[in-house]
């Protein structure tokens, strides 16, 4: 029997002639507004990006008007600004803060750490941490400051108050050839850091003859034989007990903290 093809027979039904269904008409009407929305959004984004770029780099606003320096002690803010070499009136966003940090470390050896950041709308902030002298080395009538790593970082005309004099006398010692001067200075500074507070305040000098031969010169002509920087906590505890038990001794030997010795004058 002839007639319309049905879904039961497996053939695709042909849509009837006439106007499209309402749902299809609605979808077609939505396409144009969506395209317009995308176009408007794209143009607005481009304009916004151009405006931000102009504001950051092309306008007279948001430019460097001052360089604020904090954290200085021996250095002055003026010295830090000069070494930083940040031009005023430059766009704040154009300042390469990493390059400024590298420049400061290279030009000012007294700086241990530095952080350079933007402080909107018109300031570059430079926060420095200076090296502290843990010991000094005398040379040609001047004094070289030694930091906690044993590095010589600055020359001063006068010895800083309360900083012990470091004497490295290991030129002919195998320790000097094996470890090097910087390592021996670092070991000496490590010993200073391990001292009891009162002993450290009384320490006038530190003498290094080799890696395991470090001695301290104290006030009132007293001497402490420390040995190497190893077992520092045990040596400090033993030294405190010895000084309490024998306060008038001239020489205290804690190089072997379990078998200390004292010498009277």
Curated annotation (Swiss-Prot):
<feature type="compositionally biased region" description="Low complexity">
    <location>
        <begin position="1"/>
        <end position="13"/>
    </location>
</feature>
<dbReference type="GO" id="GO:0005886">
    <property type="term" value="C:plasma membrane"/>
</dbReference>
<dbReference type="Pfam" id="PF08478">
    <property type="entry name" value="POTRA_1"/>
</dbReference>
<dbReference type="Pfam" id="PF03799">
    <property type="entry name" value="FtsQ_DivIB_C"/>
</dbReference>
<comment type="similarity">
    <text>Belongs to the FtsQ/DivIB family. FtsQ subfamily.</text>
</comment>
<keyword id="KW-1133">Transmembrane helix</keyword>
<dbReference type="GO" id="GO:0090529">
    <property type="term" value="P:cell septum assembly"/>
</dbReference>
<feature type="topological domain" description="Extracellular">
    <location>
        <begin position="59"/>
        <end position="265"/>
    </location>
</feature>
<feature type="domain" description="POTRA">
    <location>
        <begin position="62"/>
        <end position="131"/>
    </location>
</feature>
<keyword id="KW-0132">Cell division</keyword>
<dbReference type="GO" id="GO:0032153">
    <property type="term" value="C:cell division site"/>
</dbReference>
<comment type="function">
    <text>Essential cell division protein.</text>
</comment>
<keyword id="KW-0812">Transmembrane</keyword>
<feature type="compositionally biased region" description="Pro residues">
    <location>
        <begin position="14"/>
        <end position="23"/>
    </location>
</feature>
<feature type="topological domain" description="Cytoplasmic">
    <location>
        <begin position="1"/>
        <end position="35"/>
    </location>
</feature>
<dbReference type="InterPro" id="IPR005548">
    <property type="entry name" value="Cell_div_FtsQ/DivIB_C"/>
</dbReference>
<keyword id="KW-0472">Membrane</keyword>
<feature type="region of interest" description="Disordered">
    <location>
        <begin position="1"/>
        <end position="25"/>
    </location>
</feature>
<keyword id="KW-0131">Cell cycle</keyword>
<dbReference type="InterPro" id="IPR026579">
    <property type="entry name" value="FtsQ"/>
</dbReference>
<dbReference type="GO" id="GO:0043093">
    <property type="term" value="P:FtsZ-dependent cytokinesis"/>
</dbReference>
<dbReference type="InterPro" id="IPR013685">
    <property type="entry name" value="POTRA_FtsQ_type"/>
</dbReference>
<feature type="transmembrane region" description="Helical">
    <location>
        <begin position="36"/>
        <end position="58"/>
    </location>
</feature>
<keyword id="KW-1003">Cell membrane</keyword>
<dbReference type="InterPro" id="IPR050487">
    <property type="entry name" value="FtsQ_DivIB"/>
</dbReference>
<dbReference type="InterPro" id="IPR034746">
    <property type="entry name" value="POTRA"/>
</dbReference>
<protein>
    <recommendedName>
        <fullName>Cell division protein FtsQ</fullName>
    </recommendedName>
</protein>
